[in-house]
């Protein structure tokens, strides 16, 4: 069983344990979600909201396990607004951003819709919350992309900044793989050794369980340069696991003889770039460079596995007003 699937299985087991004493009409809502991580975070949102309703007398029961269908019908939109306002104003801890508030509001709306569809409640109380109450001014943020010079300077720091040869070769291979494929760091740490396919076809590739996926693998190509550095790392990795008798199938291993963590990758990026470069910036670098080389946004969407062209275009297609004016003038 691959690491990501095993991790999802453990999340499912823990969640099942937490939901064991939760009324069925509430617990069944989470079966609608495919991703274990989504189930977990949505359960936390619902759990915290219901606990607040209990603590504030909106539901007159001792615990979530005692909640009935009638109790859910007693909750009003004003109760939910008060809860969301306390989150926004930091009364319940760290203040939530408007984006975070809207995410939770959307989960609550889906939850009440589910209850209404199953005839547990008469209406979706979230629908009565004014749409603009938690509206945030969404401003498009240009992606941060390091220059070629900054990337080379970063690689030099990675090469010179660590006396441990295994760490150096591994870290450079990680940087070159992200830079040569656009893979996400979360996807990278989930990779096992057998996910690499360097020689089966004319072009090297890897099989990736993408974002939010535990069943369907994506075929992701890599650059010749990334392949070259991976080959060097794989020789070092083979020596490393034989000397330490490691059986872990993880592609990238730590000095603790286990799979590298996402935090470890973020940490060495920050350390050797003085905080100027982080892994996702290299993903943006790939998208920009690939678009500039091909002028084909569909290549970018395919390689970076964006859900739609609009997302890819928003980040990587930059249109100059004067170019538009000149083109229209010639119509």
Where are these regions (language model features)?
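A short, glycine-centered helix-capping/turn motif at helix boundaries
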Residues: 119, 177-190, 293-295, 306
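Conserved tyrosine-mediated DNA breakage-rejoining catalytic core shared by Y-recombinases
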Residues: 186, 190-228
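Short basic/aromatic active-site micro-motif
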Residues: 169-170, 258, 275-294, 311
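Short, polar N-cap/turn motifs at the start of nucleic acid-interacting alpha helices
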Residues: 198, 275-276, 295-315, 321
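Active-site/catalytic core of tyrosine-dependent DNA strand-transfer enzymes
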Residues: 223-276
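Basic, Lys/Arg- and aromatic-enriched nucleic-acid-binding interface segment
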Residues: 152-185
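DNA breakage-rejoining catalytic core of tyrosine-based enzymes
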Residues: 136-155, 213-225, 241-242, 246
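N-terminal core-binding DNA-recognition domain of tyrosine recombinases/integrases
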Residues: 6, 24-37, 44-141, 161
């Amino acid at each position: 069983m691959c690491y990501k699937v095993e991790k999802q299985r453990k999340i499912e087991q823990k969640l099942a344990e937490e939901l064991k004493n939760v009324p069925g009409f509430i617990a069944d809502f989470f079966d609608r979600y495919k991703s274990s991580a989504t189930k977990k975070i949505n359960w936390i949102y619902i759990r915290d909201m219901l606990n607040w309703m209990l603590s504030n007398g909106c539901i007159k029961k001792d615990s979530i396990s005692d909640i009935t269908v009638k109790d859910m019908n007693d909750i009003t939109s004003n109760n939910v607004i008060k809860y969301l306002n306390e989150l926004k104003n930091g009364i319940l801890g760290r203040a939530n951003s408007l984006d975070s508030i809207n995410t939770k509001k959307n989960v609550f709306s889906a939850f009440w819709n589910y209850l209404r569809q199953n005839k547990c409640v008469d209406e979706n109380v979230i629908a009565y919350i004014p749409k603009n109450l938690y509206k945030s001014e969404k401003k498009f943020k240009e992606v941060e992309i390091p220059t070629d010079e900054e990337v080379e300077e970063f690689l030099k720091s990675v090469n010179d900044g660590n006396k441990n040869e295994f760490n150096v070769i591994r870290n450079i291979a990680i940087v070159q793989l992200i830079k040569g494929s656009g893979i996400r760091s979360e996807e990278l740490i989930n990779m096992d050794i057998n996910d690499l396919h360097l020689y089966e076809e004319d072009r090297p590739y890897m099989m990736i369980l993408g974002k939010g996926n535990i069943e369907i693998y994506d075929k992701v190509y890599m650059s010749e340069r990334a392949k070259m550095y991976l080959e060097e790392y794989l020789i070092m990795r083979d020596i490393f696991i034989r000397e330490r008798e490691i059986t872990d199938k993880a592609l990238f291993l730590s000095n603790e003889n286990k799979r590298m963590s996402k935090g470890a990758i973020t940490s060495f990026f920050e350390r050797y770039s003085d905080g100027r470069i982080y892994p996702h910036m290299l993903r943006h670098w790939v998208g920009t460079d690939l678009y500039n080389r091909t002028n084909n946004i569909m290549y970018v969407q395919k390689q970076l596995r964006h859900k739609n062209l609009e997302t890819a275009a928003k980040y990587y297609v930059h249109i100059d007003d004067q170019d538009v004016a000149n083109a229209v003038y010639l119509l």
